[in-house]
């Protein structure tokens, strides 16, 4: 059984709940970020767009010690693209460890509205396709559980789980997540991929 580490770069941004309310995912990511900054300034709200260095160090420790034997490191732009990666890797009932600010199971109250794969429900689709079975979500202290399905997700703040307790990973998927990661840090996904590729 494969162990999958899925890392969404928005995991590192601890003030997501503050600036997320200004977001518009119907716009391009760059337009949405311009709107966020404009609305925040209009409301005289100062936003902090820097990653949490402690969370970054935590993930680097995992990459150094638990990703030495990964058979595949994939870089994707949005999280729903992970489905193709898992299919290509022949995943079946894999253990998924999702490092993400968001839960990504389902945000719809009405299941009929959740019939197409999106970046908000990709875990639900990975389960439907039997790509993953056990799901662990590692988020931030202010991440919120919102999914409306019976899919069991073990969830914790990264601060409550020691990095050395994770298993060795077979597949590492890193997601840029442009709507939720400030543009200045889109390059962080590539940097972490290169960091993981350099691990021996």
Set out the residue ranges of the language-model regions.
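Conserved alpha-helical scaffold segments that buttress catalytic/binding sites
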Residues: 2-200
């Amino acid at each position: 059984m494969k162990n999958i580490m899925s890392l969404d770069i928005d995991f590192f941004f601890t003030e997501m709940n503050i600036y997320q309310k200004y977001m518009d995912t119907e716009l391009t990511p760059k337009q949405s970020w311009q709107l966020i900054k404009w609305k925040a300034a209009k409301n005289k709200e100062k936003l902090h767009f820097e990653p949490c260095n402690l969370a970054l160090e935590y993930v680097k420790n995992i990459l150094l010690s638990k990703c030495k034997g990964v058979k595949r490191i994939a870089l994707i732009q949005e999280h729903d693209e992970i489905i193709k990666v898992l299919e290509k890797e022949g995943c079946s009932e894999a253990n998924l460890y999702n490092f993400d600010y968001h839960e990504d199971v389902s945000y719809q109250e009405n299941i009929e509205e959740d019939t197409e794969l999106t970046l908000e429900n990709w875990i639900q689709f990975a389960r439907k396709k039997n790509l993953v079975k056990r799901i662990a979500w590692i988020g931030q202290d202010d991440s919120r559980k919102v999914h409306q399905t019976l899919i069991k997700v073990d969830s914790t703040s990264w601060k409550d789980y020691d990095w050395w307790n994770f298993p060795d990973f077979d597949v590492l998927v890193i997601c840029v997540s442009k709507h939720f990661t400030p543009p200045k840090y889109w390059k962080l996904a590539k940097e972490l991929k290169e960091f993981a590729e350099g691990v021996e």
